[in-house]
Amino acid sequence: MILSCGEALIDMLPRTSTAGEACFAPYAGGAVFNTAIALGRLGAPSAFFSGVSNDMLGEILADTLTASKVDTRFLARSDRPTTVAFVKLVNGQATYAFYDEGTAGRMLSTDQLPALPATISTLFLGGISLVNDPAASTYEALQARDCGTRVTMIDPNIRPGFIAGKEAAYRARIGRMVARADIVKLSDEDLHWLEGQGELTALARGILAKGPKVVFITEGANGARAVTATQDIFVAAQKVTVVDTVGAGDTFNAGVLAALHRADALTKVGVASLSDATLTAALSLGTRAAAITVSRAGANPPWANEL
């Protein structure tokens, strides 16, 4: 089973009321939450760990997970409020205003870390949950605790505007977590933010030198690549009409993990010896699933039968 660990929040998405007025409607979201949902829909064994409120918005989150076949037994429930993000869409690109102080997600602490059964093979971490303490330190502690026995994957999903005034501490945390991870996923923009300018494969090999076994890089509408010490495999993206890009990278992550699960490769040994065929299958499922997500509004990952 793959345990996605990170933020769950309510996206307030812009809509138009029946009276023609501008309004916002609540939708379950969060980068890591979206990956858990996409994994469940793709038929992979998926579970989710996060701080989730007992309020009505928290119930929306829990119900949405259950509807997509995600195991919710590891949720750390509390009476703190739910994180809310108001979303503005301009030409399909999303910008966010976050309301996160004192929430169930942000205040997650190490004493809420679950004891995990042996059936959990893989931890997926990332997103804005790695920015603010105490939650960020809690997720890092979970990775540090379990990285010796379970596969861990990280996608920082970097939002430079969200880390203003915290960049040094954030870079240090991401550096530590990347070094512990078996699998790293970065957009081309994130890779440049972390490693500077240069050719993508060379920069990815710099990441590999820190400890990971494979780096997946998404290159927007062009496609995605997988880089190991000896491999550099690229798969072109499907051409689709883009409605918006919300959840695209999150869905890609799920496709990669689902494909690796299908190949029985989510073990420490398996991730260290991925074949060209397995990497190609992972890139293919990731890009195909993401193409469906961007072709419709919001983070609405595909079910397996849609592929």
Could you tell me what each predicted segment is?
Residues 1-70:
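Glycine-rich phosphate/adenosyl-contacting loop at the front of the ribokinase-like
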Residues 8, 31, 128, 156, ...:
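Active-site metal-binding loops of divalent metal-dependent hydrolases
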Residues 18-26, 164-167, 272-273:
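Short glycine-enriched, charge-decorated loop/helix-capping segments at active-site entrances
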Residues 45-128, 132:
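Conserved N-terminal subdomain of the carbohydrate kinase-like
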Residues 45-46, 72, 150-152, 215:
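Hydrophobic anchor at the start of a short beta-strand
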Residues 101-110, 164-169, 271-272:
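Short gly/ser/thr-rich secondary-structure transition/capping motifs
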Residues 122, 128-205, 212, 222:
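Conserved beta-alpha-beta core of the PfkB/ribokinase-like small-molecule kinase fold
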Residues 196-307:
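Conserved phosphate-binding/catalytic region of the ribokinase-like
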